[in-house]
Amino acid sequence: MINLDIARRRMVENQIVARGIKDRRVIDAMLKVPRHIFVEEAMSAQAYSDSSLPIGEKQTISQPYMVALMSGMLQLTGKEKVLELGTGSGYQAAILAELADRVYTVERIRPLALRARKALDSLGYLNVNLKIGDGTDGWASEAPFDAILVTAGAPDVPMHLIDQLAVGGKLVIPVGNQSEQTLVRITKGENGAVSREDSIGCRFVKLIGRYGWSGED
């Protein structure tokens, strides 16, 4: 029987810290949040492997390193209001809940949203607000957000998401074609000015919705 606590520590040491993640708050969050709670019980032994894993509905839970990297790119201090688009398993939302003050997350697939809510509730994450809907719309009624994290690959950066950012806020999103993307960080400055930084190449499931890919693409 695998010791999941030891497996989680080794995941952080070998996959996160060893690859250059230095943000202590991100490291502590990855050490704390039990990834195995967010996958099917039959896959618990693989929960801390260096890979994404299927969670049903043709969706995946992201590779731990990618979760840590994207979380760190938001540069959270603990006071922020954060929007996540694409709840999936709920694992990324749990990490954000450790790093920010409030988390708002949107999932288009109802069964995934319900499972994620159950997992988040079981761990006591009362600062996570989840709704079912088209995540590409964002969550305009709760804007502005200090940070927005998109967990699926988009064809381009949706400008209305930048509109939902507070001044100084950051949007992290994979942008590219349906098979390969680049991790992009947008920072919103005064008077609506934006700056863009491109990071590493990545592969995410498609961002499906009005401002993403169609489900038939």
Curated annotation (Swiss-Prot):
Single GO cellular component term: cytoplasm
Compartments it resides in: Cytoplasm
Active site: S62
Any GO BP annotation: protein modification process
CDD domains, per database record: AdoMet_MTases
Highest taxon, organism lineage: Bacteria
Key words of the record: Cytoplasm, Methyltransferase, S-adenosyl-L-methionine, Transferase
Main location: cytoplasm
Molecular function in Gene Ontology: protein-L-isoaspartate (D-aspartate) O-methyltransferase activity
UniProt cross-references to Pfam families, sorted A to Z: PCMT
Catalytic reaction list: [protein]-L-isoaspartate + S-adenosyl-L-methionine = [protein]-L-isoaspartate alpha-methyl ester + S-adenosyl-L-homocysteine
EC nos: 2.1.1.77
Enzyme class, first EC level, given as a word: transferase
InterPro entries: PCMT, SAM-dependent_MTases_sf
Described purpose of this protein according to its UniProt entry: Catalyzes the methyl esterification of L-isoaspartyl residues in peptides and proteins that result from spontaneous decomposition of normal L-aspartyl and L-asparaginyl residues. It plays a role in the repair and/or degradation of damaged proteins.
Family: Belongs to the methyltransferase superfamily. L-isoaspartyl/D-aspartyl protein methyltransferase family.
Protein name per Swiss-Prot or TrEMBL: Protein-L-isoaspartate O-methyltransferase 2
Lineage: Bacteria, Pseudomonadati, Thermodesulfobacteriota, Desulfuromonadia, Geobacterales
